[in-house]
């Protein structure tokens, strides 16, 4: 599933082209994705201007004129791409994914050039909703989200606050979207390895009123920031179906220290990385370095 860095990479790839563009036409190649498309979806979009493109956690927010926002989630395999006529013709002949193009918007940019904004989703777990922009952040999908890991308020102190009395694992708490918005399995595994913290460790141990606990919480917060920043710079991680807006691949997976490296040597101590299941998800870690 695309996580925060992948979604932010999509946002950064689309934003310069689509901001200020007018939606000229909308083609839906099916009636639904995970959920049915909003009623009269195409008709409601045609003629609108895309005022900007935001992100909250793993959601893309296409802000439109007339106070509506397309709330888009990529699901397990969704992607957006932007093409002119030349690139679209080329992709239609070389890409095995074109048959999974479910939404195509023709948009006219501020300079008059026409682009094709396409949503592709092999597994169809993504979805799009139309939401009133004026009450956007009161929407049930957004209202209870926690802090963004790149926000100024995200810190070791914040983690200590939310870890108080949490007997569940560090990994379990960090994957809770009401506590940290946008983090997923890959980057939690990577940040915990950098922090030398076991994914099985009780979260409450970092909330203790000791200097050691404060230092561990501060280190974890910083390593989460670092992993996210580096992944965005690399264009995200290409696992299974994820591609960037220009059709190219993300490269952060080449920098994984633990994720997907079961049986390979720990880059710090040399013993084999192990994989365990936590709540049905794979956790990769070094049993010697991470305590």
Curated annotation (Swiss-Prot):
GO biological process: base-excision repair
Cofactor note: Binds 1 zinc ion per subunit.
UniProt entry keywords in alphabetical sequence: DNA damage, DNA repair, DNA-binding, Glycosidase, Hydrolase, Lyase, Metal-binding, Multifunctional enzyme, Zinc, Zinc-finger
Cofactor(s) the protein requires to work: Zn(2+)
Alphabetical list of InterPro entries matching this protein: DNA_glyclase/AP_lyase_DNA-bd (IPR015886), DNA_glyclase_Znf_dom_DNA_BS (IPR015887), Formamido-pyr_DNA_Glyclase (IPR020629), FPG_cat (IPR012319), MutM-like_N-ter (IPR035937), Ribosomal_uS13-like_H2TH (IPR010979), Znf_DNA_glyclase/AP_lyase (IPR000214), Znf_FPG/IleRS (IPR010663)
Active site: 2 (schiff-base intermediate with dna), 3 (proton donor), 58 (proton donor), 281 (proton donor)
ZnF segments: FPG-type: 257-291
Pfam families hit by this protein: Fapy_DNA_glyco, H2TH, zf-FPG_IleRS
Recorded family membership: Belongs to the FPG family.
NCBIfam families, alphabetized: fpg, PRK01103.1
Subunit structure: Monomer.
Name of the protein this chain belongs to: Formamidopyrimidine-DNA glycosylase
